[in-house]
Structure formats: structure tokens, C-alpha cells
Amino acid sequence: MLTLASKLKRDDGVRGPRASNPASDSTRRVSVRDKLLVKEVAELEANLPCTCKVNFPDPNKLHYFQLTVIPDEGYYQGGKFQFEIEVPDAYNMVPPKVKCLTRIWHPNITETGEICLSLLREHSIDGTGWAPTRTLKDVVWGLNSLFTDLLNFDDPLNIEAAEHHLRDKEDFRNKVEDYIKRYAR
């Protein structure tokens, strides 16, 4: 089977140094992204948190993959949460697009899958947003941390969930457990 990594190695050997060609700018941008992804995916797989699994439906498309987070502590322990990660052509100048595919009761994730994680923001006033020095490993570790130390009730995206926690922590826990039973097994 031809993988993206072997194709890129083969293509570099055939083409040699690239000449400047305006017609190939968009192709070159995709190639830059794909070359970065070959390295980053290898690093990611070597440094994956023990509570995470990655799945590449097509090994030749490293720009699209799924992440499963299975928290082993806290409110979300026992759940299996699926995320879809799509890396745009302009990567690493812009962050990957991430969506939670599992319905969840969480202050930083909406029930429709939008995610509040500062490193996924293209522009951030506090300097914690996306930067070209960040990698897929940072994204995966950040998503994993949303279930533990980055769980943030003070700056929520899902205001209703955060207010629920503030009002009645035990009822919040019960609703989280109900969502896990219904949607995250």
C-alpha cells in the first residue's frame, strides 16, 4: 500500500529541487502541509496520552483523522468521546478544525460539538492562541486536558452547563453521567 510518507519521499527523489512556478503555489502549500503532517503524526503517535487513541480512516490523508478520548478520572471518567480533526491547507499558519462528535454536557464543549480551547483560536488576545510553532500533539493534549486540568467553568462556551455546575454540582455530575450512558459508550 502506498502511504503519504512513502509518496512524499518518492516524489522528492524524482523532482529534486523545486523551481518557482506560480501555477504550483497551491500544490506546494498542500505539500508543505503534508510534509509537516508526516513528521507531526509520527511524533504524535510516539507521545500520545494513554487516555487517547487516533484513527486515520485513510492513511494517505493525514490531514483528516479522528481522536478518541477516554478519561480515566473526573466527571467524564468512563466515557468515550470522539473528535474529528481536519487540518486545512494553510496549516501551520492556521489551526486545525476540531469538532466533538459525541454529545456531551461540558462547559467548554457545546452539545453541537463546538469547542472552546484557546490554542484552537486563530487570534487570541491573551497570547495562548494558535501559533505556527504549535503541533498536532499540542491539539491532542489540549483536547485530552479539557476533561481534567483545562476543564474551565469560569470561561465557558456552554454557559448553561457552567451555570448548572455552579448551581448544583451533584445534579451536574448526574447529568454528565446520563450523557455518558446515552451517548459516550
Swiss-Prot record:
GO biological process: protein neddylation
EC number: 2.3.2.34
GO molecular function: ATP binding; NEDD8 conjugating enzyme activity; NEDD8 ligase activity; NEDD8 transferase activity
Disulfide bonds: none
UniProt entry keywords in alphabetical sequence: ATP-binding, Nucleotide-binding, Transferase, Ubl conjugation pathway
Residues of the active site: C116
Stretches for region Disordered: 11-30
Any one annotated GO CC term: nucleus
Pathway where it operates: Protein modification; protein neddylation
Region (Interaction with UBA3): 1-29
PROSITE patterns xref list: UBC_1, UBC_2
Domain UBC core: 32-185
Catalytic class of the enzyme: transferase
Catalytic activity: [E1 NEDD8-activating enzyme]-S-[NEDD8 protein]-yl-L-cysteine + [E2 NEDD8-conjugating enzyme]-L-cysteine = [E1 NEDD8-activating enzyme]-L-cysteine + [E2 NEDD8-conjugating enzyme]-S-[NEDD8-protein]-yl-L-cysteine
Pfam families, A to Z: UQ_con (PF00179)
Family indicated by similarity: Belongs to the ubiquitin-conjugating enzyme family. UBE2F subfamily.
Role noted for this protein: Accepts the ubiquitin-like protein NEDD8 from the UBA3-NAE1 E1 complex and catalyzes its covalent attachment to other proteins. Together with the E3 ubiquitin ligase RNF7/RBX2, specifically neddylates cullin-5 (CUL5). Does not neddylate CUL1, CUL2, CUL3, CUL4A or CUL4B.
Name recorded for this polypeptide: NEDD8-conjugating enzyme UBE2F
Organism name: Gallus gallus
Lineage of source species: Eukaryota, Metazoa, Chordata, Craniata, Vertebrata
Gene: UBE2F
